[in-house]
């Protein structure tokens, strides 16, 4: 073999070796890039899954919280309805007083008030027939005995009240209607009623 052939053969052999090394390096670099991309992809996938889990948990907590709030509000509404019913029934019971019981209520209420004794009594149209002249005479005599004027009279004005009465003089009213009396007791009795109904 001539030196030229040896040299050519050596150059080709070196070129092949270098090409193989370059290919091997390129393959390694390719694998490295693919591995990095896979790792990044997996990391991104985990982050997306984690974010989705957090969002789902937050949404579930919000739904549960809203549901608890609705349940609480529904319970409060139901309790309030029952309490209102108790007070409405109290007014109805007062409306169903007999004539004598009603007149006793009016008499004792008026005699317990600090009045001058010349006011007008405003009543419901339903109660007009219960108060007669004899009742007014008796009531005025009792007021006189207490040092009052004893000049109470039934007003020509009617009010849409469910019972009881309103005393009127010079633009000032003392409201002793059944609904006003029950409402005035509501604040102090409501807690007792809640305990009686719901404990």
Swiss-Prot record:
SUPFAM superfamilies: V-type ATPase subunit E-like. Produces ATP from ADP in the presence of a proton gradient across the membrane. HAMAP family: ATP_synth_E_arch. GO terms for molecular function: ATP binding; proton-transporting ATP synthase activity, rotational mechanism; proton-transporting ATPase activity, rotational mechanism. It comes from the Bacteria. GO terms for biological process: proton motive force-driven plasma membrane ATP synthesis. The lineage of its organism: Bacteria, Bacillati, Bacillota, Clostridia, Eubacteriales. GO terms for cellular component: proton-transporting two-sector ATPase complex, catalytic domain. InterPro entries: ATPase_E_C, ATPase_V1_Esu. It holds the Pfam family vATP-synt_E. Gene3D superfamilies: ATP synthase, E subunit, C-terminal, F1F0 ATP synthase subunit B, membrane domain. Keywords: ATP synthesis, Hydrogen ion transport, Ion transport, Transport. Disulfide bonds: none annotated. This is V-type ATP synthase subunit E. Belongs to the V-ATPase E subunit family.
